[in-house]
Amino acid sequence: MSRSAWKPPFCHPSILKSVNNALNKGFVNMAIKVHSRASVILPNCLGLKFAVYNGKDYIPVNVNDQNMIGHKFGEFSPTRKFTGHSGDKKATRR
C-alpha cells in the first residue's frame, strides 16, 4: 500500500536540518551524509550533494534533476553488488 494522501512526505528531521543549514550558510558544495534511505527527496534539496549510506560505504548522489524529487534516497545507492552470472561451462571446455 502507498502512503495516505493526507500525510506529508517523510523526510528525517536531521536531513531537513542539514539541508536548511547548507542553504542558509552557503555550504552547497559539501556532501550531506544520509543514513535514512527511506526519506523522500524534497524540492529544497535540488542542487545539493548527498552521501547516502548503503550499509558499507557512502554513495555520492547529486540532486540535479527535477525528476529526482519525490523519489527516496535509497533508490540511488544500491545495497547489493551484482557480480554477474557464471559463464557457460560447455563453451570453455574443448
Curated annotation (Swiss-Prot):
Belongs to the universal ribosomal protein uS19 family. GO terms for cellular component: cytoplasm; small ribosomal subunit. Pfam families: Ribosomal_S19. SUPFAM superfamilies: Ribosomal protein S19. It comes from Wolbachia sp. subsp. Drosophila simulans (strain wRi). GO terms for biological process: ribosomal small subunit assembly; translation. This is Small ribosomal subunit protein uS19. HAMAP family: Ribosomal_uS19. Keywords: Ribonucleoprotein, Ribosomal protein, RNA-binding, rRNA-binding. It comes from the Bacteria. Protein S19 forms a complex with S13 that binds strongly to the 16S ribosomal RNA.
